[in-house]
Design a protein with these regions (language model features):
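Conserved loop-to-helix N-cap of the C-terminal "lid" that shapes the substrate pocket in Rossmann-like
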Residues: 71, 111-121, 137, 145-149, ...
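A contiguous, mid-protein "functional segment" used to position or interact
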Residues: 1, 8, 195-227
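Mid/C-terminal beta-alpha module of Rossmann-like enzyme folds, strongest
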Residues: 123-186, 191-193, 211-212, 221-240
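Short aromatic-enriched loop/helix-cap "lid" or pocket-rim segments at secondary-structure transitions
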Residues: 4-9, 82-85, 151, 177-180
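Conserved catalytic-site region of short-chain dehydrogenase/reductase
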Residues: 1-33, 40, 77-80
Length: 240
């Protein structure tokens, strides 16, 4: 919902917003942000996203005096049943025993707040069961998000992969690995409010979360894989 999403997706041009954003930070001005975008999703999912936006629902709930509503703004949720398979692009390369994973040097330092699915579920239950949550808005996510290169290293540790992670200038990165976002804008959210007001703490630490996520991803790979996103010949040409 935040303007930083418009910045990173280039739908709301402007200088990068300061991060981490709080619950009081500016929201997107443009509603229905997925309309008109060529998204790498199945056609049914593309159609659903045409009318997808959380901001109108938030306004409806928070402005209705008859509803004791709570809004939770969730992070990039990973783990079992992750329909977006957030670990797959890295884990597949690791399991294919690639010698190296290439990252655009800008992407290597980019931050995005994640949340393991069970930890996010705990936050949801807490908001439902704690009366102090009524009428409040809370960001949910990990307390200390990693830059992308460290995120990949954390996955590699769990996957028992010992290759190299190589940041490269944009002009040397194969075209399928060039970021389609504005990496000057980090997607970092502050989760201080829910921790202070409701005492939220993650029951599953990062290592255990990634162990469970990697195990699920290996057992449940995507049914369709875009071969163009795994152009190993182009990646090998850079490594020579």
């Amino acid at each position: 919902v935040y303007r930083i999403y418009g910045r990173v997706n280039r739908t709301e041009p402007g200088p990068p917003d300061p991060v981490p954003v709080t619950e009081d930070s500016p929201l997107r001005d443009k509603l229905y942000p997925y309309r008109g975008l060529d998204l790498p999703f199945p056609e049914s999912e593309k159609q659903r996203l045409q009318d997808y936006d959380k901001i109108p629902i938030e306004r409806l709930v928070m402005n209705d005096p008859a509803i004791q509503g709570t809004v939770l703004r969730l992070p990039a949720v990973y783990g079992p049943n992750d329909g977006q398979h957030r670990l797959f692009e890295f884990l597949k390369r690791m399991d294919d025993q690639r010698p190296a994973i290439l990252l655009d040097e800008r992407m290597a330092q980019w931050h995005h707040t994640h949340g393991y699915v069970e930890n996010v579920a705990v936050a949801i239950v807490l908001a439902i069961t704690d009366e102090r949550a009524a009428g409040r808005i809370y960001n949910v996510g990990e307390a200390h998000p990693l830059p992308m290169i460290e995120w990949v290293r954390a996955i590699a540790k769990i996957a028992d992969w010992h290759g190299n992670i190589i940041p490269l200038p944009s002009d040397r990165v194969p075209s399928h690995l060039v970021p389609d976002i504005d990496t000057r804008q980090d997607l970092l959210v502050a989760t201080t409010r829910i921790r202070k007001e409701l005492g939220y703490r993650e029951p599953v630490d990062l290592d255990e979360a990634l162990k469970r996520a990697v195990a699920w991803e290996r057992a449940n790979p995507p049914k369709e894989v875009d071969a163009k996103q795994f152009d190993y010949a182009a990646e090998d040409a850079v490594l020579v």
